[in-house]
Amino acid sequence: MRRSVNAYQLASRFGHVNQIRRERPLTREELMYHVPSIFGEDRHTSRSERYAYIPTITVLENLQREGFQPFFACQTRVRDQSRRGYTKHMLRLRRAGQITGQHVPEIILLNSHDGSSSYQMLPGYFRAICTNGLVCGQSLGEVRVPHRGNVVDRVIEGAYEVVGVFDRIEEKRDAMQSLVLPPPARQALAQAALTYRYGDEHQPVTTTDILTPRRREDYGKDLWSAYQTIQENMLKGGISGRSARGKRIHTRAIHSIDTDIKLNRALWVMAETLLESMR
């Protein structure tokens, strides 16, 4: 696996995020306060005249009319304040009828107006017991919409394309839950995750550390339990370990939109690949 990010980096080049999550649809006021870039009124000065500027709030309002509601939103903080209203932001949306539950499929909508991102939609999965927001791999499909032409209609079409793979996500989850992992396979999955996150030179924690569940529901021996445990430990951090110099540390939580998406997606692919190899 290739090295993804520096072991002790707080975030990617996009910096920390402002974020909000609720157990109900977010209000316009909450979005305005926490994620103002959704309401940006014009493209960044670095964008050309060919850039079709459609505020994310316009896209969101159209998605809401189609029955999709935001439950989580965040945007990256930037040092260059001129980009604050244009910076990358992410929404996690649920469809009417799939609002609550222990496991809820979601549409992940990414965008920015400073040239760092097109509209991007990915399938996701929310686990209520640990507030884990999973990102499913590219094998299940994702949609990119450039800032050109009829953006709103294409994003709405993309949302329905993502909804179309929700059943396949459920099927993958059921298959992972039914597959009992022998200890060597659990260790291999955890080692692949550590290598992706930290590289080969130094890993501040061990496979045993990231395979240690945070709640009794994850003490199963199946692939789904191992994947969930690794995902939560890697993203939430707080695990005691040692730096390359031997200093005692705690792993940091991931606050970067980019790193969250990349690591989350990679973990799904690892679990999915292991599932297929052991069937």
For the regions a language model picked out, list residue spans one by one.
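Intrinsically disordered, low-complexity regions enriched in serine/threonine
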Residues: M1-H16, G97-H103, L109-R279
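Intrinsically disordered, low-complexity regulatory segments
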Residues: M1-I54, E61, R65, S82, ...
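Amphipathic, interaction-prone secondary-structure segments
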Residues: Y53-S118, W268
